[in-house]
Structure formats: C-alpha cells, structure tokens
Amino acid sequence: MEISISVSNKRNRYIIFNVNDNWVFCDESISTVLGISLLEYKQRFKNICKVFDTKYGIIINDKISDEEVVERFKQEFASELVILKMEGCELI
C-alpha cells in the first residue's frame, strides 16, 4: 500500500492523498487507512494549519508552504504512520 501527499496550487489548496492509486480528498478513505475516525482526523488536521471542511474533505486556508504542510502532517500523525510503515506502507 502506498500513501502519497500532493498539494494543488490553486487559491485554496487541497491536501490530496493517493491510497492504493485512488485519489481521495482527506475523507474517510484516509482516516480509515490511518485507523482513526473521520472526526478525530479532521480535529487533528486542524493542528496542522488553518482549514475548513467541505463535503469533499478539508481545504487548507493558510499561507504555509506545501512542504511545511507535509512536514506538519508527518509530525502530527507520526504514530499512525509508523504503524503504516510496519505494514509496508510508505508516505511520500
């Protein structure tokens, strides 16, 4: 299983994940992969940067760089990502 992060460079940036070649907008797919509830995921994501929720997921409403978002994500979800790595998953 592979999980990658990319960030669109539009007015508002979406964090988009590729989970097993399926692109998802920060929705239940990624929270399921991380093994946490969608509500917990969204609450913890708010620790990373300013966000607001849409039915499609979380839109970043912040001036931080794409790289900083990815780094903050890795720090916030470090314990979950360690578990994923143990199961052969990579976060790019």
Which residues does each predicted region cover?
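N-terminal acidic leader/helix
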Residues: 3-32
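Acidic, low-complexity, intrinsically disordered interaction modules
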Residues: 22-84
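Short acidic DE-rich linear segments
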Residues: 89-92
